[in-house]
Amino acid sequence: MQKDIHPNYQEITATCSCGNVIKTRSTVGHDLNLDVCGACHPFYTGKQRVVDTGGRVDRFNKRFSIPVGKK
């Protein structure tokens, strides 16, 4: 490795809005504030909601479909 060309790799803390503090290493150089983390993200906590778009698609198709026997 060449000397004096690599960024400074140091320990930082990433603080989530839920209060979770994560210690990691990065070249950013300052502490980070996160909006979501693995402790509060709905996908990882199991609180994820499934949006039912089937009703909307069916309603659109029914409204804008052309009847078969009509010209």
From Swiss-Prot:
Indicate whether Ribonucleoprotein appears among the record's keywords: yes
Signal peptide start and end residues = none
InterPro entries named in the record: Ribosomal_bL28/bL31-like_sf, Ribosomal_bL31, Ribosomal_bL31_A, Ribosomal_bL31_sf
> A single GO molecular function, which one?
structural constituent of ribosome
Q: What note does UniProt attach to the cofactor annotation?
A: Binds 1 zinc ion per subunit.
Any one GO biological process? translation
Q: What keywords were assigned to this record?
A: Metal-binding, Ribonucleoprotein, Ribosomal protein, RNA-binding, rRNA-binding, Zinc
Instruction: Kindly list the GO CC terms recorded for this protein.
Output: ribonucleoprotein complex; ribosome
Gene3D superfamilies for the chain:
Ribosomal protein L31
Q: Identify the residues that bind Zn(2+).
A: 16, 18, 37, 40
Q: Which cofactor does it need?
A: Zn(2+)
- What is this protein for, i.e. what is its function? Binds the 23S rRNA.
Assembly mode: Part of the 50S ribosomal subunit.
NCBIfam families recorded: L31 (TIGR00105), PRK00019.1 (NF000612), PRK00528.1 (NF001809)
Give the family from UniProt: Belongs to the bacterial ribosomal protein bL31 family. Type A subfamily.
This protein is called: Large ribosomal subunit protein bL31
